[in-house]
Amino acid sequence: MTEVKSGLPLVSVLISSYNHADFIEASIRSVYAQDYPNIELLVVDDGSRDDSVAVIRRLQEELGFHFLPQANKGLCTTLNEMIARSAGLYIAPLGSDDLMLPERLSLQIAFMEQHPETGICAGGIVLIDGESKLLPDKKQRYRPARRLDFDDLFMDRKPGPPAPTLLFRREALEKVGGFDPSIRIEDYYVELRIAHAGYFIDILEESLALYRVHGNNTYKNRRLMIETELEIYKRFEDHPGYEATRLRYLNAMFAKVASEDRALASELLTQIPWRSRNLKTLKGLWRYCFTRAA
């Protein structure tokens, strides 16, 4: 793919594969189905325990992309190492269970080339299940195009960019030092840092990727997720909207976990002052008092 001399900027697509033997082939082939002509594909298997390596090696022999199997290092470290080895002016991480739609990169690059102030370009997603069937329309997420600055993202004024569609300007990623291995919610934190550095995040209205919803990609450790999100907010505690953002999140998470983890719900509730409680708090209290935890 990198032999093409199109005059268009090179895009480095990075796939960090982990235990997705059933899905990785579709992800890789979706990269080769792009109508954008100047792409390099780097694939790393990050210590999978299934047949992912065998599947990827077979595809590598057929298609000729860069492939490296390794012991598990974690997603952020792996992505940073892949970025260092890549050559593209634009970086497109792709989940090893997700798929690019054919016009994705051509639409994003056309936009990014016209908007040097944009550090990240994203777009809509279409939800599919583990068998690649579309989820019902009521579960799909159709949203208009939008531009986000730091305040929009940090204070949740507008819906953020769908992770399966993120395209980074290399310059922006390098300016903030890449992904932070100490933060588990890697996409949200790097988005905030890039926006904080003065770049915009633009989300196109077009659907650009198929996002696979299946049993192995749900975030099961709710406590760790909440602690990580609060740690991300704390790294921007000098922002005037920090306390409002933190309290809004605590209220929302209390309502969400009240019926499933009473101990965690109690801890969250103690962090919400009476004056900052709202309808979500009341909803959570109802669930806490009248719903039996699973």
Give the label of every model feature segment.
Residues 3-8, 189, 196, 201, ...:
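C-terminal subregions of glycosyltransferases and related glycan-biosynthesis enzymes
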Residues 84, 142-232:
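Conserved nucleotide-sugar donor-binding catalytic segment
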Residues 30, 45-54, 73, 95:
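A conserved acidic beta->alpha catalytic loop
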Residues 22-25, 50-58, 99, 103:
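Acidic helix N-cap motif at the loop->helix transition within catalytic regions
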Residues 1-32:
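N-proximal low-complexity "stem/linker" segments adjacent to membrane-targeting elements
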Residues 91:
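Short aromatic/hydrophobic "clamp" motif used to bind/position activated sugar donors
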Residues 70-86, 107:
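Glycine-rich, basic loop-to-helix element that forms the pyrophosphate-binding segment
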Residues 103-136:
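Conserved donor NDP-sugar-binding/catalytic core segment of glycosyltransferases
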